[in-house]
């Protein structure tokens, strides 16, 4: 059963007498999820639809992430996680609710409307442990990319939006709306002992890793990274050269540091 609260915004009508308003329906709704209320686009055909129908998204993957972080939490008093390609924030919300004040999360989203929804969800749940960034994570900081956003009032897989053309696109039929500029950021901007990185940025994963060389020289975070659209060979070699162990997790690579203390069962080893 889909559970949602439809939200409508009131705007003052310039042609009406003072005090009159007209209402413009929004495609966004506040939905119940396993982790608290979350703002979703009712036209979203993948993430939003699954949350509306089941209360979650990638529940098995989220469960795996939590188990891995629980292992790290046994030796760390506070965890640091990056949600790269946060979309509307279901992963950040789940991890923040589960670990509470024991985790600090940086969530990055390039699509401004999704970033706004992410921020709204954080406010609805009074979550202070997540800092959200309207940035496209890439190999450099301070560059700008002009992107043509999809039409959020029509059905589509908004999480599949591609900031730059990837090696393998599955989204050429997306109906476009208007163009705007987003600034890039490299993960090397942050010099902190990050424990976990979830990365799903529709083909820009290789560029994001190129902007994180210093990070991986100093720290060895667990990485859960999508490899469907990106330069797969580069990504695999990146982790192999750093003595990571790699496992297939659906369309994702789970990369564990060589010193991770617990063996992995139930996933196919890639290296």
Task: Enumerate the predicted regions with their spans.
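Phosphate/nucleotide-binding beta-alpha loop and adjacent structural elements of enzyme active sites
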Residues: 1-271
């Amino acid at each position: 059963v889909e559970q949602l609260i439809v939200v409508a915004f009131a705007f003052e009508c310039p042609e009406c007498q003072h005090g009159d308003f007209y209402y413009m329906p929004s495609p966004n709704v506040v939905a119940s999820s396993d982790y608290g209320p979350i703002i979703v686009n009712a036209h979203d055909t993948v993430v939003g639809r699954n949350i509306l129908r089941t209360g979650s998204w990638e529940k098995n993957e989220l469960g795996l992430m939590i188990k891995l972080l629980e292992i790290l939490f046994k030796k760390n008093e506070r965890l640091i996680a990056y949600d790269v390609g946060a979309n509307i924030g279901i992963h950040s919300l789940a991890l923040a609710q589960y670990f509470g004040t024991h985790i600090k999360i940086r969530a990055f989203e390039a699509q401004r409307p999704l970033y706004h929804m992410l921020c709204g969800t954080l406010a609805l749940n009074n979550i202070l442990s997540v800092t959200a960034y309207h940035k496209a994570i890439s190999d450099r900081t301070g560059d700008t990319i002009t992107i043509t956003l999809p039409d959020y009032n029509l059905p589509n897989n908004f999480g599949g939006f591609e900031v730059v053309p990837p090696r393998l696109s599955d989204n050429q039929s997306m109906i476009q709306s208007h163009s705007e500029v987003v600034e890039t950021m490299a993960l090397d901007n942050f010099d902190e002992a990050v424990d976990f990185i979830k990365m799903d940025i529709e083909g820009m994963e290789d560029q994001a890793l190129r902007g994180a060389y210093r990070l991986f020289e100093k720290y060895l975070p667990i990485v859960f990274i999508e490899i469907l659209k990106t330069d797969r060979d580069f990504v695999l070699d990146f982790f192999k050269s750093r003595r990571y162990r790699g496992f297939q997790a659906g369309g994702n690579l789970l990369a564990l540091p060589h010193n991770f203390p617990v063996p992995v069962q139930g996933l196919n080893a890639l290296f």
